[in-house]
């Protein structure tokens, strides 16, 4: 017999990516390959690329959320490098992490020294009260 019509044999389960197993959007397999090819260590454990992909995904989501808020504050629907710059520099922890990073087309934060601002006169102080 040719084996047609035989019931039996094991049905192989549908392949599931390591990213979907970990509940991530970032590619765990690609991170693992890059860790191996990058000569960071002789061997790479199974959990290392999952952890690194999760950290990268978290940082990306955090920056994109803040940049989206900056875009919305400027009444724009598209995130541009300026919004990324504003998001990173206005967040204390992200600014510390990316302090030495230059963002192309990012511009600078608006900042006027207090001594350069016009001084309040007595008449302005009375009006403001």
UniProtKB/Swiss-Prot annotation:
Where on the chain is Phosphothreonine found, per UniProt? 121
Signal peptide range in chain numbering: none
Pfam families according to UniProt: Histone (PF00125), Histone_H2A_C (PF16211)
User: Which terms in the GO cellular component ontology are assigned?
Assistant: nucleosome; nucleus
- Residue numbers carrying N5-methylglutamine: 105
| Function summary | Core component of nucleosome. Nucleosomes wrap and compact DNA into chromatin, limiting DNA accessibility to the cellular machineries which require DNA as a template. Histones thereby play a central role in transcription regulation, DNA repair, DNA replication and chromosomal stability. DNA accessibility is regulated via a complex set of post-translational modifications of histones, also called histone code, and nucleosome remodeling.
Partners and quaternary state? The nucleosome is a histone octamer containing two molecules each of H2A, H2B, H3 and H4 assembled in one H3-H4 heterotetramer and two H2A-H2B heterodimers. The octamer wraps approximately 147 bp of DNA.
Please give the family membership noted in the entry. Answer: Belongs to the histone H2A family.
Please identify the protein, giving its name as recorded: Histone H2A.J
The protein's organism comes out as: Rattus norvegicus (Rat)
Q: What is the lineage of its organism?
A: Eukaryota, Metazoa, Chordata, Craniata, Vertebrata
């Amino acid at each position: 017999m040719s084996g047609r019509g035989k019931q039996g044999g094991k049905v192989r389960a549908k392949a599931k990516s390591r990213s979907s197993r970990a509940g991530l959007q970032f590619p765990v397999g690609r991170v693992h390959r890059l860790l191996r090819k990058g000569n960071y260590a002789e061997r790479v454990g199974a959990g290392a690329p999952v952890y690194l992909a999760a950290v990268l995904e978290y940082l990306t989501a955090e920056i994109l959320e803040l940049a989206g808020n900056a875009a919305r504050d400027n009444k724009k629907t598209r995130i541009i490098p300026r919004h990324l710059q504003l998001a990173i520099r206005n967040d204390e922890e992200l600014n510390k992490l990316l302090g030495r990073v230059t963002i192309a087309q990012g511009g600078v934060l608006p900042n006027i020294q207090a001594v350069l601002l016009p001084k309040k006169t007595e008449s302005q102080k009375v009006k403001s009260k």
